[in-house]
């Protein structure tokens, strides 16, 4: 697109961050709650930057802004009922202030941002493992525009057969096809708004057959060891 040009910036400086965090954990037989208060400030923060010339051509690159501060609260809670049910909920809300006065007097943002997520893992009759998870990004303001947020849910089931030698799994990402967001971008002499939507709903099916015997001395060799993959985990990890 000749009217939207992207280029690099070889003069970027590294970011330097100073942070402070206070954490607390409450643990009972079935429930664990972790809370964290945090504050951090970053100098020479790296951000995308857009300029539009008199001919209407947009130039997109990365720049250093003077400073950015983030302060807020993060909470993670996990509840278990034996080995059959696990619920994990997390969320964070924080205030962000960005100072870009090194580039323009009024460049920057000052507002709240937040996100949340959940994950439910369950063992049901017949040896089936079920997992449902979701995530939410709250609307927020950025240096040169706004982001309107989104929500998304995924689900998966799996089952072992023949004494664990065969495992079948089925996963659906973005079940309700909701992963899209609206945005605005504005600066000196330009304003743009739009909606971004990508193909996000997919169905994944897999069958794994394990055979042979893994010798003790071979465990952990190769790419991170046997079973080091992260996809489709039902042990509390993300898909």
Where are these regions (language model features)?
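Outer-membrane beta-barrel channels and translocator barrels
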Residues: 17, 27-31, 70, 80-84, ...
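Extracellular loop and loop/strand-boundary signature of outer-membrane beta-barrel proteins
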Residues: 1-10, 58-64, 74, 99-107, ...
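Outer-membrane beta-barrel translocator domains and adjoining extracellular loop/strand segments
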Residues: 1, 5, 37, 45-54, ...
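Outer membrane beta-barrel strand-and-loop segments of large Gram-negative receptors
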Residues: 7-13, 19, 28-90, 104, ...
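Transmembrane beta-barrel strands of outer-membrane/channel proteins
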Residues: 18, 24, 35-39, 89-95, ...
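Conserved SET/PR domain catalytic loop and adjacent active-site segment
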Residues: 25, 78, 157
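Conserved C-terminal beta-signal and adjacent last beta-strands/turns
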Residues: 109-239
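Structural signature of outer-membrane beta-barrel domains
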Residues: 29-31, 40-44, 82-84, 94-98, ...
